Amino acid sequence: MTLIQHPRDATVFAPGLPRAYDTHRAPWQLPAGKKLAVSVLLHAPSYQDVPPAGSFKPIAMQGGVGRDTAEPKHGQLARLSQWDFGLTVGIWRLLGIAQKAGVPVAVALDSFGVRTMPGLADLVAERAQEIVVRGSAANIILDEAMTADEERAYIAEARSAVEAATGRTASGWFSPERANSARTAGLLREAGFDWFGDWPVDERPVALDGAASGLTAVPFGLETEDMFALYTRSLAFPDYERLLDETVEQLIADADVVGGRFLGLSWFGWVLGQACFADVAERTLTKLAANPQVLLVTPGDVAALHR
Amino acid sequence: MTIQNNDRLVYEAMPTRPLVTWPEGRTVAVWHAPNVEHYDYIAPGGGTPQGRTRYPDPQHYMHRDNGNRTAFWRMLRAVDRFEIPSTVSLSLSVLEEMPEVRDAMAERGWEIMSHGISNLRPLYDMPYDDEDRFYELSQQLAETYYGGRRIKGMLGPKVSGTDNTSDLMVKHGMTYHADWIHDEQPRPLRTEGDGRLVSIPYSFMLNDVPLLLAKHYPGSYFVDMAKAQIDRMLRDADEDGQGRVACIATHPFVSGQPYMQRYLEEIFAYLRSDDRIWVATAADITDHYLENSYDEQLAHANGISAAREARA
């Protein structure tokens, strides 16, 4: 008998997410005495100016003129072309930086991008250590109002397009705008995915249960994400770099107390790939690669390591 | 059939493109785009400069108008000191109604980039014939009041457009469109017919309105961003040989404020400190690209596309 009677229409906890708390769970042991596993996920999403009828779109999203996050009027090209910058220039700058630093990366592609941008998928497949499926387009999202079959079809279409275009098998998923229905994790597992990166819920991977059993939530942090830090929060880029440095330093220190830590760096071609911000990525990855306490690993490998 | 915005882009990833180069071995072209704007006191349709009160909004009308009465002239002193060629993103009503401002720009040889008639008269949903007449009027204004020089490009008023904008710009003799910020180089834009139109990289990154007015960074951050952006482009160009473009977008009512002068001068001094930087106008950059790169870039991108279709 509990004291709280939750309203019938409330879902109090995320389905599939076991409740577990630091200092009350066995520490996560990383190989070779490493203290911090870091995965870099580079987003290469495309923006569909006129989504198909019936698509679900975000209420607000970043990119465009000023700080207005509402959907731009048709005919304004700022958001469309700013997101496209990630595909023409930004993602390649970030891939070059990672390659020079010797850091393995996963690149997340969507079906609209690989269908409409000739050469994008081939070149990413040559340069990325892991391919991740990122839905239909940056601004076509999963939504609770979809039926299960609609959501299954969305997931299947995206996966099929990205795998066909890259010639690579994808074991990981990232939802545009991190938008989910309550069913999403279970449907991703049903579709055969091993991990997904949507949930910034922990500092170590989380094995899900219930319908999503077998799926690992690889937590790509929100506060350390470039779009959230530089756009949503409007941090100045030197402050963002300091935030990253201090996060790494603290996570390594915490590992001695609560066990191995994970840091998922979620970076967008159209954000950190901008020339004015790219040195933050370069310096951060160079420092991480030189840190003997850090294990640099793709998210697919970190999910496998955790299982 | 109207070309959709996504389809206007001629995609090719930067690493596979033929090299784009700039005159005299320079590697980063930088254009200064002062937005000299007029905002109607009471705008057709009732728009306001800031969306703060119902019209009129004297606070922001006056704030912007002061940009042309005082701040513009202060900015000119910095432009003159560093001899910065400028491409004015111009509310074209200024040509007819502010001869002092017009003549100061003309004396310095500033290039006019259309920014509409007023910055509170966007193009959204404008019928084809009305938009057609808008470009006709734009060119008439330039020919009448600016030494017969026709306008070569546009940044849509209030960054607006329609599905017909690119095609109508070509019809009226324009060659560059600044609303696209999808690249560090000009890129071909698909249009109906054989007209050649390119995107010219404008900026909402190195732009005083998003940085200072919308996001409230200090003036010194505008300098930090400009230096970070151009430094990185210079290093990348040294490495891969690709010429790049940066834009410094200013507005008199923002960058012309007294406290901003030192930062504007710091940016201009930086532009003059490195011989690899080509300080040019949007038309200089566009003309050079059309002459030397456009056909090769288009053919190369089309080749990649054709190879993919053949493989499929």
What is each model feature region?
Chain B
Residues 201-234:
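A conserved mid-domain beta-alpha-beta active-site/ligand-binding segment of alpha/beta enzyme cores
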